[in-house]
């Protein structure tokens, strides 16, 4: 029986490893193809589209950088602004729902969380009219930042409230006895204890904002204000119409992927800590 069990376990492990390998290959292959094609010229792209060819055309990256460098800085500004605004509002909202008791609290919380269930496409037109006509924020960074941050806040409140509820109540009670008001408890106790979850929320919002395409496309008109997703699509269409190949545009996609990869590489530990902490504590 033991031998039979060991064989079953070994077979299941082998099957699991094969499945993981296949999934990893499916994830890595498109990005690897993107890198390979970004070094080609027209003839190499046509006749050897998915294999390495020589010479490597690094000038594709020079062309792409000249076109996307301004929009990279725009995207950094927009993504960081959205992430910071969302984290601040979510932390304050989550803390209020976690620590304070007021009439209708659970109803308000349920309505806030219910906003996540509404497909964003349903309110796209009304949001556009509100931002561009009512608040006169068309073709401005504020028109991109404020609505996107507001849309991410309900999830942040839900995430942080669950984490705040799990923190030791004794620490806050002791601080209250020592004379610390709610603001001091929030700034000096709750937030420092919640850094992994706060960092996780920041990273999730940053990646969402960095990759967002539809809303910046609708709001921004001046090319100097384009975010990277909008600018890359414009660059891809323009370059292909003029030259009939995609390599410099693909080089642009590689360039704009690097900040996310570097950011995640340096913060993956905090990201995983926050996700696992949230899984156990929510």
Language model features by range: what are they?
Residues 1-3:
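N-terminal Lys/Arg-rich, disordered targeting/topogenic segments
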Residues 6-282:
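A structural signal for multi-pass alpha-helical bundles of membrane permease subunits
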């Amino acid at each position: 029986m033991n031998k039979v069990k060991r064989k079953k376990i070994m077979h299941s492990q082998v099957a699991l490893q094969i499945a993981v390998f296949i999934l990893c290959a499916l994830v890595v292959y498109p990005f690897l193809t993107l890198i390979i094609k970004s070094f080609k010229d027209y003839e190499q792209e046509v006749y050897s589209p998915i294999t390495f060819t020589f010479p490597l055309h690094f000038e594709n990256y020079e062309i792409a950088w000249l076109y996307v460098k301004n929009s990279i800085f725009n995207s950094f500004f927009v993504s960081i602004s959205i992430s910071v605004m969302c984290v601040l509002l979510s932390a304050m909202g989550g803390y209020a729902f976690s620590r304070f008791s007021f009439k209708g609290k659970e109803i308000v919380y349920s309505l806030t969380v219910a906003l996540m269930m509404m497909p964003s496409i349903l309110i796209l037109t009304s949001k556009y009219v509100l931002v561009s006509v009512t608040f006169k924020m068309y073709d401005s960074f504020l028109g991109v930042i404020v609505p996107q941050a507001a849309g991410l806040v309900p999830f942040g409140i839900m995430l942080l409230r669950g984490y705040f509820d799990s923190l030791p109540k004794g620490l806050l009670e002791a601080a209250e006895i020592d004379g610390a008001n709610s603001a001091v408890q929030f700034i000096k106790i709750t937030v420092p204890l919640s850094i992994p979850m706060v960092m996780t929320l920041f990273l999730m919002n940053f990646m969402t904002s960095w990759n967002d395409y539809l809303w910046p496309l609708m709001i921004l008109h001046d090319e100097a204000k384009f975010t990277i997703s909008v600018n890359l699509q414009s660059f891809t269409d323009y370059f292909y119409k003029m030259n009939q190949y995609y390599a410099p545009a693909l080089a642009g996609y590689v360039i704009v992927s690097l900040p996310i990869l570097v950011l995640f590489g340096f913060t993956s530990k905090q990201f995983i800590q926050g996700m696992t902490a949230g899984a156990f504590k929510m």
